[in-house]
Swiss-Prot record:
Domain of life: Bacteria
Protein name (record): Large ribosomal subunit protein bL36
SUPFAM superfamilies xref list: Ribosomal protein L36
GO molecular function, one term: structural constituent of ribosome
PANTHER family per UniProt: 50S RIBOSOMAL PROTEIN L36, CHLOROPLASTIC (PTHR42888), LARGE RIBOSOMAL SUBUNIT PROTEIN BL36C (PTHR42888:SF1)
Family to which this protein belongs: Belongs to the bacterial ribosomal protein bL36 family.
NCBIfam families in the record: rpmJ_bact (TIGR01022)
Species in which this protein is naturally found: Dehalococcoides mccartyi (strain ATCC BAA-2100 / JCM 16839 / KCTC 5957 / BAV1)
Coiled coil: none
GO process terms (BP): translation
Entry-linked HAMAP family: Ribosomal_bL36
Pfam families: Ribosomal_L36
Alphabetical list of InterPro entries matching this protein: Ribosomal_bL36, Ribosomal_bL36_sp
Keyword tags: Ribonucleoprotein, Ribosomal protein
């Protein structure tokens, strides 16, 4: 899980999702997991 100021998709399978006011990146590749913070 990477915590970043700007969350961007890293591949074509990445999805940007907003959960409880937190922007997250979800992907099949665990290295692409991101959260805005």
């Amino acid at each position: 899980m990477k915590v970043r100021a700007s969350v961007k998709t890293m591949c074509e399978k990445c999805k940007i999702v907003k959960r409880n006011g937190v922007v997250r990146n979800i992907c099949t590749n665990p290295k692409h997991k991101q959260r805005q913070g």
